[in-house]
Amino acid sequence: MLILVSPAKTLDYETPASTQTFTMPALLEHSEALIKVCRELTPADIASLMKVSDKIAGLNAARFAEWHRDFNLDNAKQALFAFRGDVYTGLDADTLSEGSLARAQQHLRILSGLYGLLRPLDLMQAYRLEMGTKLANDRGANLYQFWGDIVTQEVNKALAEQGDDILVNLASNEYFKSVKPKQIQGQVITPIFKDKKNGQYKVISFFAKKARGMMVRYMLDNKVSRYEELLKFDTAGYYYSEADSSVNEPVFLREEQA
C-alpha cells in the first residue's frame, strides 16, 4: 500500500529529528523553477497571493531568497519531522520505532506545493506554498498546471515499488487535486472520518485531520498491507461502519467526545 498525506503550514526546525538518516527530494529541479518565480514576488505580493499577514509574508520572502539546492542537515530537515499540524500530531513521528520509520520511507508520501512529492526522510528547506496557490508560472496559472502529470507519475512509480496496487488517500482535497486519479495505476481508497456531534455523524475538520495521521501511524505500526487490515483501524475510539461505506470510501465513525 502507498499512503498519501498533505503537508502542514506549521514547521518545526528547532526540535532535532530522531534520525540522522536522510534522502533527497526527487523533483528539486522543478522546485528550483518555482523558487525563481517566487523570488520575483514582493512581500506585499506574497501577502495578497497567500492571504497571510505582513509578518508571515516577510518571513516567506526571506525563505524564498535563502533557498538553495545544497541541502544538508544544517540548513534543511527531513520532511516527516519538519511538518507540524493536526495530521502530524496524530502521526506523532517523533515516537516512531526504527521499523515503522523504515516502513514510512517505503509506503508514505507527502504531497507538496513546492516539492511535488516527498518521502518522509527527504530533506527540505522551510517554505510556505500551498498547492491551491494561484501562482502564475511558465506552465500555467496555478500550481496544479505547473505540476501537471509530474506528481501522478511519481505516485505511479512509488506504487509500482509497493508490490500491490492500493493507494490510500489521506490527503486533503486541495492536495489530492494535484494527482490525476484516472491515471493512477491502482485502486484509490479514500477513508472518511466522522465524529458524532449533536446526535449526527459529520466530518469535523480538526478531528478528521488528526484521524488521518492516526491512521498512518496505525498502518505503519501494524504493518498493514491489505485492505481488510485497514478496516480494523480503531485508534482513539474510531470504528469502521460497513453500512456507511463504499469500497473506495470506507467510513470510520466515533462517538461524541466529552
UniProtKB/Swiss-Prot annotation:
Q: List, alphabetically, the InterPro entries matched.
A: YaaA
Pfam families attached here? H2O2_YaaD (PF03883)
Task: Provide the Gene Ontology terms for cellular component.
Answer: cytosol
Q: Name one GO biological process term.
A: response to hydroperoxide
Per the record, the similarity remark reads: Belongs to the UPF0246 family.
Cite the PANTHER family for this sequence: PEROXIDE STRESS RESISTANCE PROTEIN YAAA, PEROXIDE STRESS RESPONSE PROTEIN YAAA
Q: What is this protein called?
A: UPF0246 protein Shew_1093
